[in-house]
Amino acid sequence: MTAPAVAINGLAKRFGSALALDHVSLEVQPGEFVSLLGPSGCGKTTLLRIIAGFESPTQGRVSIHGQDVTDLAAEQRPTNLVFQRGALFPHMSVGMNIGYALRLRRWSAVRIAARVEEMLALVRLEGMRDRMPGQLSGGQSQRVALARALAAEPKVLLLDEPLSALDLKLREQMQLELRAIQRKLGATFVFVTHDQTEALVMSDRIAIMQGGRIVQTGSPQDIYRRPNSVFVSGFIGQTNLLRGRIVGQDGARSTIDVGGVHLSAPTLPGMAPGDAAILLLRPEALRLRDPGRAEVAGCALEGRLTDQVYLGHCVRITIAGPGGIPLFADLREEEAEGLNKGDIVALVWAGSSPILMKEDFA
């Protein structure tokens, strides 16, 4: 059986009395693109630095391709790290930057030159070998940093928010390029970000971190469609939270009283009538009621339109739901045409759309 590219077992890290990592375990398979996603201070960068060898864990072990590297220095590990800002050597040309680690490994000049050209082609910077870092744009600098990190063929590439300093359009372009490079090489990437879009676009799996712990791991689709907590649902995409109490169950479905309105959702095992509950609804799951189409019982709400915002790909409307709670719906432009502030709007959704959660998960 192939060993994981990265195996993290029971990692804990303290800085004085502060617990930065709380017994974290995670496996990354060879060729996987895994993102560590979470808010500032959740421990994701600390975890990456421990994998890289720049921090030592208080407890736990790190293995790379079956080798325990916990006690090895950073330069002895088969990893490379790309920082938030490229950290290029300003006195070296692009080619010299890319070939730096290869010279330390005593590669021949001919071999280094060939590898530099190969890396420049990979990141689409052909012809820029002799440029200096001060002559590069932000996106070009990050491409050079990526080429430098990949040149020595690390077993695992670690990336610490490498796109966060770029403007939006360039960041979106680089997300696709980075993912394409990873797929082409079949390399193992561990990527730290606080940007949910980056994680969704690029990752094979996402590990959501909160308070020094990994609270959910899964594919982008799994985490978006089946979040295991209110925190995860809110961190990945916009969501509507409707709080209420279960008042009935009929096999696979539960009825929840939300401010006097009975709504229906797939039953969550372990929940029973009388339990406090939270109903999650994604804005894109909501549609205007079609008078000619039968709706699913318990999957409709009416409210007064309080706002609408044009987002380009959709129009996000806000209605006052049960108890005045704002409810967001993302409608097609033609759907929202003719709606005005103050209108009574009826929204419906598919019976499979709601996600039921226990109130104590909040």
Q: What are the language-model segments listed below?
A:
Residues 7, 27, 63, 346-348:
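ABC ATPase nucleotide-binding domain
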Residues 33, 74-84, 88-231:
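ABC ATPase nucleotide-binding domains
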Residues 37-39:
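The feature captures the beta-strand-to-loop junction immediately N-terminal to the Walker
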Residues 52:
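Helix-to-loop junction immediately C-terminal to a conserved catalytic motif
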Residues 58-61, 111, 211, 243:
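Conserved coupling/switch loops of ABC nucleotide-binding domains, chiefly the family-specific signature
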Residues 60-68:
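Conserved ABC transporter NBD signature motif
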Residues 239, 249-362:
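Non-catalytic connector elements of ABC transporters
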